[in-house]
Amino acid sequence: MEKKITGYTTVDISQWHRKEHFEAFQSVAQCTYNQTVQLDITAFLKTVKKNKHKFYPAFIHILARLMNAHPEFRMAMKDGELVIWDSVHPCYTVFHEQTETFSSLWSEYHDDFRQFLHIYSQDVACYGENLAYFPKGFIENMFFVSANPWVSFTSFDLNVAAMDNFFAPVFTMGKYYTQGDKVLMPLAIQVHHAVCDGFHVGRMLNELQQYCDEWQGGA
């Protein structure tokens, strides 16, 4: 199981078409960037309710499918080398009302939604009441999802002091709301410019919207 979870391919930076971009955005122009969209979840939410699924794991699974579909969202520095993980797994926040704190919990990704939902449900049942920051422990090949369901927003930025080798995407979901006949949800994503450009984020967000429009409840 460990081999499956942590497999990767090394990138030969000297032969990589993004060599100059990577070196620039990891050194003299080191930066991450954030983008916030108002995602139309009208059809997705309707299907979630129709199939009596929970919104959070269903949406996390869609994000995980997209992260695993594109190598730019699976990159990391490991032992001084740039690598592409064979797969990445969602690490998501679980809120604790009694302490007003949260935990970060990860679940192994599977293409099949129902199999992923089973794993997610087991993880939440086992670790959901644990107040530790990482109750299940930590793995290297994760991307991050945070939920802020108490407020809607039009912009959201993460300000981390040292992001030089942190390439994992970070998503933040806001409170969804009705606008006309649509249900919209704020969604922010932070990526590292060394491995991911605006084109890549734009393509992913367009695919995400299509997934939400066409999602069939994991069938």
From Swiss-Prot:
GO terms for molecular function: chloramphenicol O-acetyltransferase activity. GO terms for biological process: response to antibiotic. Keywords: Acyltransferase, Antibiotic resistance, Plasmid, Transferase. It comes from the Bacteria. InterPro entries: CAT-like_dom_sf, Chloramphenicol_AcTrfase_AS, Cmp_AcTrfase. Its EC number is 2.3.1.28. It catalyses: chloramphenicol + acetyl-CoA = chloramphenicol 3-acetate + CoA. It holds the Pfam family CAT. The active site is at H193 (proton acceptor). Gene3D superfamilies: Chloramphenicol acetyltransferase-like domain. Homotrimer. This enzyme is an effector of chloramphenicol resistance in bacteria. Belongs to the chloramphenicol acetyltransferase family. PANTHER family: CHLORAMPHENICOL ACETYLTRANSFERASE, SLR0299 PROTEIN. This is Chloramphenicol acetyltransferase. It comes from Klebsiella sp. The lineage of its organism: Bacteria, Pseudomonadati, Pseudomonadota, Gammaproteobacteria, Enterobacterales. The gene is cat.
